[in-house]
């Protein structure tokens, strides 16, 4: 009897462990779905809002990059939203491969992405220009190979200097200056003045 009771307790314990493991996996999947963009797999805006202060605290200096994909509306209108989605995914996958491991890529909204990087503005600008000029991201639309182009604005950040929303706004403004200057690239603070 005693052995049967022990075996039953062990079975109950094993079953409880399996249930807890499943529950932990379910919670982890939910957490991932809350932090990741479903289409691109990039971190999403909620994750940026949650992680950006910690990233900037852990990296005394670095860069915030605001990226806007060029021609996404045109691709959606002329070739369909499925191709527009593929355009976004292609960009995101290539950017993830081109970035440092410690850099974080976020899909901020629509065709807008943010990068938090421990690199100085000049370093990340070099990397972005290399992607645009020397090793562009190719995209196939119905057998036509096109380069994915984007405009960006970069601001430097230092620990405890400036609100995150202000940095995003400044990087966004620099990105629009970049677009209005026929895609001339704009870098660190003061470069646009």
Task: Please describe what each predicted stretch is.
Residues 92-93, 124-141, 172:
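Alpha-helical scaffold within the catalytic cores of cyclic-nucleotide enzymes
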Residues 104-107, 146:
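A short pre-motif secondary-structure segment
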């Amino acid at each position: 009897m005693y052995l049967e009771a022990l075996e039953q307790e062990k079975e109950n314990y094993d079953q409880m462990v399996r249930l807890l493991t499943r529950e932990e996996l379910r919670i982890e999947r939910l957490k991932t779905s809350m932090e990741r963009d479903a289409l691109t797999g990039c971190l999403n805006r909620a994750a940026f809002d949650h992680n950006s202060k910690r990233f900037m605290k852990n990296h005394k200096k670095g860069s915030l990059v605001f990226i806007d994909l060029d021609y996404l509306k045109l691709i959606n209108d002329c070739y369909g939203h499925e191709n527009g989605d593929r355009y976004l995914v292609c960009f995101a996958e290539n950017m993830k491969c081109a970035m440092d491991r410690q850099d974080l890529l976020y899909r901020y909204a629509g065709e807008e992405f943010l990068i938090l990087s421990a690199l100085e503005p000049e370093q990340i600008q070099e990397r972005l220009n290399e992607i645009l000029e020397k090793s562009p991201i190719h995209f196939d639309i119905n057998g036509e190979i096109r380069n994915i182009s984007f405009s960006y604005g970069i601001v430097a950040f230092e620990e405890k200097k400036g609100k995150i929303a202000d940095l995003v706004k400044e990087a966004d403004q620099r990105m629009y200056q970049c677009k209005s200057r026929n895609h001339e690239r704009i870098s660190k603070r003061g470069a646009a003045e």
